[in-house]
């Protein structure tokens, strides 16, 4: 048995156990279960005849692609670089094109060389997630890390481009493409305070983006949210809509910021079965232990036989005047946003309005492992979720509304019928509460 077969057996058996309850739903593009004995035998036959890591990575990538809903994939172990050449590059039709650039004139242009090296050869400098087309290796989406300027050739045209931080580049693209480019948007709509948060990412939390509030310039989301909270308290405001539609999650550090709009402490303690915990521990631990040091720390913690993880989510008392919070959610909410939605339903922190989330909030996310061959190619196997993104793990809103198919920049515009419905719901509840008080 060669080393490629041995290592593939580790990956295959591990994924087969991990995804046991999902196997009947995981079909390849040819409607063949990639975990079937036929699929396994076919791959082993290929592996028995290969002689290079590149051939091995090609087969592994093909196997991951057969899990075509993104349940597992190969990825570079390297962290995101501090600085990049500010271009998003994509491979299509056997060529590389600029998809996004601060300089819009470069978009949709074909890149032929970088620093005088043909693009096909230049990508060989990268270790990471490769794909294959007719035997040719390529990277689907390419970002060029660099601390210094690069000369980019577009056919006969050459341009020297200076690097910038990836965070600044992302911000420039968002600002250009989105009229509501700030991560946080605050407004008073028909008498109801409206707070929109586009992303819960750690990067956005640490950003230095500028906000304008009543003529004053404010730097960063923490200061901005604090100014908004003080404004609402000073006006004794009791109702607030928090819109997280389209927010795909990020860091639960944002929960501490939402405490600014809380009138008391809210806590939810829960226990969640991990993917590993759902399986037979005898079989699963045999697979895990077989991986030895190849398996990373985040997975090793599950080896002790504990079938669940104890978790706690809380939002502190911010002494806010806000008594009634309304959380707008939709099917573009994942991860931490789903956690916040579940938390709101469980504790009453907010009344959820909209359509169901896409789940994956109260689960183990994500984890990964590597093997000797993947490690020497600076790659790892990433499993982005617990594979239980099913209806029972989605969050249903307390009040359902018809979901609009909106682009991110269309939220809170005249096209946003969901928000219009939410405003009417909040106004009706506010009027009902005022009437109840007047009758007391």
Predicted segments with their positions:
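A short pocket-lining beta-strand/turn micro-motif at the edge of beta-sheets
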Residues: 348-349, 377-381
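Cysteine-dependent hydrolase recognition
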Residues: 284-285, 293-310, 333, 357-358, ...
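Gly/Ser/Thr-rich loops at beta-strand to alpha-helix junctions
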Residues: 246-251, 333-334
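Active-site rim recognition segments
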Residues: 384-417
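Gly/Ser/Thr-rich loop/hinge elements
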Residues: 249-324, 366-367, 371-373, 386-389, ...
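Amphipathic coiled-coil/heptad-repeat helices and related helical stalk/stem segments
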Residues: 221-225, 311, 336-337
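Flexible, low-complexity junctional segments that flank or bridge functional domains
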Residues: 1-240, 244-248, 256-273, 324-326, ...
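Extended C-terminal subregions enriched in glycine
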Residues: 324-346, 350-360
């Amino acid at each position: 048995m060669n080393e490629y077969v041995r290592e593939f057996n580790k990956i295959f058996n591990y994924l087969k156990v991990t995804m046991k309850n999902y196997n009947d739903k995981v079909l390849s593009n040819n409607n063949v279960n990639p975990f079937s004995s036929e699929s396994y035998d076919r791959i082993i036959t290929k592996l028995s005849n290969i002689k290079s890591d590149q051939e091995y990575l090609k087969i592994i990538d093909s196997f991951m692609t057969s899990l075509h809903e993104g349940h597992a994939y190969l990825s570079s172990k390297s962290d995101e670089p501090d600085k990049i050449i500010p271009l998003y590059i994509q491979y299509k039709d056997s060529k590389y094109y600029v998809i996004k650039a601060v300089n819009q004139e470069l978009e949709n242009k074909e890149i032929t060389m970088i620093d005088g090296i043909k693009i096909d050869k230049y990508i060989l400098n990268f270790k990471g997630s490769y794909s294959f087309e007719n035997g040719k290796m390529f990277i689907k989406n390419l970002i060029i890390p660099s601390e210094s300027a690069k000369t980019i050739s577009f056919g006969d045209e050459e341009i020297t481009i200076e690097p910038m931080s990836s965070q600044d580049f992302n911000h420039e693209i968002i600002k250009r493409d989105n009229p509501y480019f700030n991560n946080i948007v605050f407004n008073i709509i028909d008498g109801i305070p409206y707070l929109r948060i586009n992303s819960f990412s750690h990067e956005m939390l640490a950003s230095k983006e500028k906000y304008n509030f009543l003529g004053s310039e404010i730097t960063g989301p923490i200061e901005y949210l604090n100014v908004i909270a003080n404004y609402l308290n000073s006006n004794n405001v009791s109702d607030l809509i928090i819109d997280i539609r389209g927010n795909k999650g990020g860091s639960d550090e944002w929960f501490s910021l939402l405490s600014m709009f809380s009138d008391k402490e809210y806590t939810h303690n829960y226990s969640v079965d991990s993917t590993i915990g759902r399986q037979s521990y005898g079989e699963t631990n045999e697979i895990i232990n077989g991986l030895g040091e190849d398996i990373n720390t985040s997975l090793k913690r599950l080896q002790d036989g504990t079938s669940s993880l104890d978790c706690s989510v809380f939002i502190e008392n911010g002494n806010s005047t806000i008594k009634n919070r309304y959380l707008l959610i939709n099917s573009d909410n994942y991860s931490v946003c789903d956690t916040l939605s579940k938390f709101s339903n469980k504790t009453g922190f907010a009344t959820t309005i909209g359509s169901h989330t896409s789940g994956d909030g109260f689960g183990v996310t994500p984890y990964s492992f590597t093997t000797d061959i993947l490690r020497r190619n600076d790659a790892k196997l990433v499993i982005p979720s617990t594979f239980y993104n099913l209806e029972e793990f989605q969050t249903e809103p307390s009040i359902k509304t018809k979901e609009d198919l909106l682009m991110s920049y269309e939220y809170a515009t005249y096209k946003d019928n969901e928000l219009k419905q939410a405003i009417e719901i909040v106004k009706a509840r506010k009027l009902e509460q005022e009437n109840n008080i007047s009758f007391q």
